[in-house]
């Protein structure tokens, strides 16, 4: 042990580092030879045939009147354009074949880069990602034995976990730490409820009459008026001095 704990999972697949191929990369002799071979084959087997075919097709379309020729230069501009298009189309079509040749080339950084890129595209995500190394290098050099100070730091950093009793997990009404319960009011006293008397409709009606009679002025029933009000008064005569007499 050298004071550093380095844990790795067994059978972990670690990808080989991809060679750095930038703008200043200098190809090897084998790569230069393969470049020249690809250029020659691309020119004779792809660019020339496609350029000639494009020019023949363009000339046939001009002869049939489908394409119009230039009034001064005739069909030369369109034939040149068809030749250029066919030439570059042939070069693009040979790129895949040239890449396959470089992949088969041994001891070639360029071929290794092409193979690694193809494997990364074809493999599922995370297949070639390196497994994290568990280095206990947080507080300087560490070994399998940890100090009490490091244990205290780890305990403070980690969140505290309070286990819930088994009986609480079986009870659905026990709160689980989430404040989603609904506050309930105080339960009614069950002992006082039987003591209350039931109020009938007649009692309520009589109480309403009493309260209504207090708020209104007292009115007497015409049938209970005194008898003297019902008896018509006798007509009396009054003299000029205010004296009255009956006839």
From Swiss-Prot:
GO BP term (any one): regulation of stem cell differentiation
Misc. comment: 'Asrij' stands for 'blood' in Sanskrit as this protein is strongly expressed in blood vessels.
Subunit text: Interacts with OCIAD2. Interacts with STAT3.
Modification type Phosphoserine: residues: 108, 116, 123, 193
Notes concerning its domains: The OCIA domain is necessary and sufficient for endosomal localization.
Subcellular location: Endosome
Name of the featured protein: OCIA domain-containing protein 1
Compositionally biased intervals (Polar residues): 136-146, 168-177
Organs and tissues of expression: Expressed at high levels in the brain and at lower levels in the heart, ovary, testis and kidney. Expression is strongest in embryonic stem cells and in the blood vessels.
Matching InterPro entries: OCAD1/2, OCIA_dom
Biased composition (Basic and acidic residues): 192-210, 218-230
Domain OCIA: 1-112
Coiled coil (residue ranges): none
Cross-referenced Pfam families: OCIA
Family the entry assigns: Belongs to the OCIAD1 family.
Species this chain originates from: Mus musculus (Mouse)
One GO cellular component, as annotated: mitochondrion
Keywords (A to Z) from UniProt: Endosome, Phosphoprotein
Function description: Maintains stem cell potency. Increases STAT3 phosphorylation and controls ERK phosphorylation. May act as a scaffold, increasing STAT3 recruitment onto endosomes.
Induction: Expression is down-regulated as differentiation proceeds in stem cells.
Region (Disordered): 113-153, 167-230
